Amino acid sequence: MEALNSMRDNAPRLGTSATAESITSKHTPHAFSNSHDSRVGDERIVVLGGVPLRGEVEVSGSKNSSLPILAASLLASKGQCILHNVPHIADVGTMCEMLQALGASVQREGHTVIIDAENLQSHSAPTELVRKMRASFYVAAPLLARLHRAEVPLPGGCVLGPRPVNYHIDAFQKMGAVTTVERGAMNAVAEHWHGASIYLEPKNSSVGATVNIMMAACLATGTTTIENAAREPEVVNLAEYLKKMGGKIRGAGTATITIQGVKELHGTEHTIYNDRIEAGTYLTAAGITGGDVTVHGLPPVHLSVYIDKLQEAGIEITHGDRWIRAATVQPLRATDVATAPFPGFATDLQAPFLTMMCLAEGRSAIEENVFDVRFNYAAELLRMGADITLTENTAIVRGVSKLSGAEVQATDLRAGAALVLAGLGAEGRTEVTKVEYIDRGYEHFVDKLRSLDGQVVRQTKSGNKK
């Protein structure tokens, strides 16, 4: 308790006496390395609940924008790619290690990453890196487009059920690649790399397939059209980057994207969008704890459907051009949601929202339509006193008057964050293990929660503070 109170009292206030930049000012230029690796499995987040979160927080750069944009830097055959607002998270570290393993030079200064891929050499992605995260498969398209050959193991990352890369491979085949999948890896050769008309299944509008096809098509002969393309802001951010590199792309942000191939792409300078999922997480934390939180750096249009659902749940929302405030002024109301591709309810915010519904009055139905397995964390919430029943792809949540602290285990990135939020809204002490999942996508998660008065500390297994 003393350690938690001490950390809370000394925490910086984002938006008042400190900013996100001041937290990371200790970083100096260096070749990129993944500093989280040595800590994997050795730490936990300890939470004392019952304190409403209040204050302001700066949203970091987007994980889901950073990863494809970093991979797309391999397409530049001359000049440096300078990327700003890149978050300090484990998945970015893994992707930068991947680029280095393939022959690119990668340097970092604060939130800026500089990539020089002129001497791209290897067409073979290291298995140990690809299996760390699904987004590693994004390097397949740049390798095929530049080297006309790619050997990429099938990806890993969070366990969210089967997420095959068949859409990606089918598109590569239509563009002229000869592919095989053997011993857990895709091998592809593309002697004649050309544009194609590609139709994606409308149910999912795969973001991963959309961005891989966009990258692949930039250096293909002729025109490529993607029907039922993903419309996420992260797709738009990538398209903006590719166009700065010399690519010819129309329609990003709509269901039909057209790419006219060019002979080469060059380095450029670009800024990563801020993270809408991180913003939604902190807004939800206000509801779970009965608090009042303002997030800065995100246009509300990136969260419009989620904002509507927060309001339906009884949270008061106000916003400006690049800020959103969530204030809890009345008891939470049960609210039904169904996840869907953008502009629908984001699957990455399903776990935080379900956690909030555990404390709402009434019965909620949370329907998961994007991933087959994304309720594994529900068993952990049951340990805290939640009332949840799972039926196929739907969780029925009956609100309870309180949650109780317990030792729980993160099952994936977003579930890990949601369990920390559950601890903040619970009575007593909660310990969250497997926090390496959270490191994959949230920059300075504990520091930011502490800046909002959250009683949170990160510890090693021996109890030492980090």
What are these regions (language model features)?
Residues 2-466:
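Short, structured segments at the rim of ligand-binding sites
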